[in-house]
Every structure is written in C-alpha cells, then in structure tokens.
Amino acid sequence: MMAQNSRLFEMDSPYADAKVDKDSIGSSFDSSQTSTSSSSSSVKRRRDGDEEDDDHSPSKKLVTEDSLHSQKVATHYNKIKECGLAERNKSRIVYMRNFNNWLKSVLIAEILDKVRQKRREVTVLDLGCGKGGDLLKWKKGRIDKLVCADIAAVSIEQCQQRYNDVRRRGHPNDRTFSAEFITADCSRELLSEKLQDPELQFDVCSCQFVYHYSFESESQADTMLRNACERLRPGGFFIGTTPDAYELVKRLEESDSNSFGNEVFSVTFQKKGEYPLFGCQYDFSLEGVVNVPEFLVYFPLFVEMAKKYNMRLVYKKTFKEFFEEKVKDGKNKDLMQWMQALEQYPPDERGQLSSSGPGEYDHAKRKAADPAVRRPLGTLSKSEWEATSIYLVYVFEKMS
C-alpha cells in the first residue's frame, strides 16, 4: 500500500493533454443512416427492416449476422475462466484494473448518495453485470434489491455464486440486499418480460463497459436503452462507462495504419475516414483479457436517443477528467490508496514495477526528481494510462 501522503498520479502520456477537434471528428461520422425528429427527439428506425416491427419478443427474433455477433460475445465471456485474487494480482494491468474499479466505486457511491436523499429503499439494475464485479459496491452502498442481467449464462452463474458467497460471509446482523439474476441479450430482449415482478421500478441502472456492444445496430442500441431506462423511477439515474468515440477516432487518424495501441492493448479498425453511426466495428484486445469486436458510440447520438425515454444527460467526463475532479476529495483519495489503484514509484526494495518497457515510467521519474515532491509517488505505467484514457463516464437522469 502506498504512503498516505504520496503524490497521486502525475500523467505524461502523449494523450493526456492533446486537444481534440470534436467538430471535425463529429463530421466524419456518417449521419446518412439515421435522422432525429425535433418533435419527439427520438431516433427513427431505418435499418434491417425495423421501421414497422416493434415486437422485441423472442419469438420474433431471426438468426442474422447481428445475432451471430451477439452469440460470439456470449461465447467469448462464457469461456473466460474465473481466477482468484492471487492470479489477478499477477496481471500486467493489475493497477489499471484497480484504477477502473476505484473509478466505478466513486461513481456508484456518489449516485447512491443522491438517490438516498429522496428514497430510503434503493433498487438497482446492473445491466451487463458480468461475473458480479460490482456486488461488493452495491453491498457497501446498502441497497435493498439488485437485478443482475447479462448475455453470458456462465457469467450469471458465477455472479450468483459470488452473491451467495457475499451473503454467507456476512455478519448475521448485516443485512444483504435481495437479488435476481437474468440471462438475456439486453440489446434484443426486453427485461420487463423476464422480471419476477414486471412492475418493478429501479432507482439506478448501472451499465459498466457494456453499452458500446449494442451500437452494432440502431435497433439494438435502442433496445439496450429501453431496458436501461424504461423501468427507472422519475429522478432515477442511468450511469455507466464506455469507450470515447472521439478519442478512438483521434488516435486512429494520428496512426500510420488502421490500428494503434501499446504493450497492453490494441485497437484495430477496418479502415479510416468512414465512421457510420451504427455498426462502426473495431477489434479490441487487452492483455488477452478481451478480444471481441466492439462498436463506436457517437455520444451526441446516444444523448439524443436517450431523450426518447425521458432521459437527460447530467454528467459526462473522460476518465482523466473524472480522476482529476474526484481525487481532490480526501475520502476518494484514501479509497484510491486502500484499493491500490496506483502503482508505487519507485518501488520498495522487495518490489518491482509492472513493466520493464522503455519509457513506461519516465513521467514518474521526472516528477520524483523534483526535490519538492514527496516520495514515493502513485502512478500508472504509460501503457496502462493510454489504455484506460480511451474511456468516459456518463450519468443520465430520468425526468418526471
């Protein structure tokens, strides 16, 4: 664990201070695929013959190229083996994972505090819950009910097992929230048809590192939004994290090829210069952890689509901006140190750095050379920062 007074996270990556010409990048997206109505602020369906077919029931689903991709995603995550804490700590990207986990912890805690100002009982939908990596966050947030939904059946089974373990390890007087587990492709199936209580309403929907998969098509993106938002109470929140399309396109355009990355991650597009609003596919890999196709989320379109479900964007920050804002709060800074979300530099005598690659810690080395700076520092390697800084945080609120 890092020293209590360590200086936190000095960044010196080529992307940390780069200016993004968002107007020029936005104009690169192909708007011919869709139009928005000024009267309804909703996105009309134009693709795959969906103009007149609003029936999302399983009986209406066809086996298409899109659905085959969803099956690939489910199969991929079903094959990922569960590993213990000791094994995860050997990962090259352990500090980046911890950093992302800290960021989610801060986001979830702040939103639950807002909700609890209005309601004593809190119900949450974890949309794309995976293996249940946020279960302890919900327990710490003292919620009352959690619904977990994911496309991968094996992930849902592991999530349920984790939940049972949390309950079993808890103190007899320590009440744990009730939970419901649903296996579903949330970009194609309506959760309201699968809930034990079809009238259940949520105070929060959390969608972490998931929503971009739904931007394969307009109908999928819309169904995912519907699942996230239609059962939210007025004043409820839809929160999440997703890749920043502006940042991805900027780095791609700066690259000499159709790909970019470093020793921990890579992103590969089929070509440059054309970025359709839906189905803009790229291949993403992260230290062997994830290697499935993903899709750009053009955020202005995301915001416009959300209006259909009476949602208003109230917060949007890149991970860099979120960190710089939230670490100013002492309790968040303490949490970051407790979660070991930054790597100690220089390491102690028995430790070693996560990477021996050239230039990975030059930014920390320069900072540590300043006599006015207290050592040790807390940092991420250059490669980890470049990987995590492609993401952003968003919060939508349900209007009355």
Curated annotation (Swiss-Prot):
Q: Enumerate the residues marked as the site mRNA cap binding.
A: 131, 137, 162, 212, 294, 391
Alphabetically list the UniProt keywords.
Methyltransferase, mRNA capping, mRNA processing, Nucleus, RNA-binding, S-adenosyl-L-methionine, Transferase
- GO terms, biological process: 7-methylguanosine mRNA capping
- Which GO terms of the cellular component aspect does the record hold? mRNA cap methyltransferase RNMT:RAMAC complex; nucleus
**Low complexity bias locations:** 25-42
Instruction: Fetch the InterPro entries from UniProt.
Output: mRNA_G-N7_MeTrfase_dom, mRNA_G-N7_MeTrfase_euk, RG7MT1, SAM-dependent_MTases_sf
Domain mRNA cap 0 methyltransferase span(s) in chain numbering: 91-399
Give a short account of what the protein does. Answer: Catalytic subunit of the mRNA-capping methyltransferase RNMT:RAMAC complex that methylates the N7 position of the added guanosine to the 5'-cap structure of mRNAs. Binds RNA containing 5'-terminal GpppC.
Q: By what name is this protein known? A: mRNA cap guanine-N(7) methyltransferase
Q: Which organism is it from?
A: Danio rerio (Zebrafish)
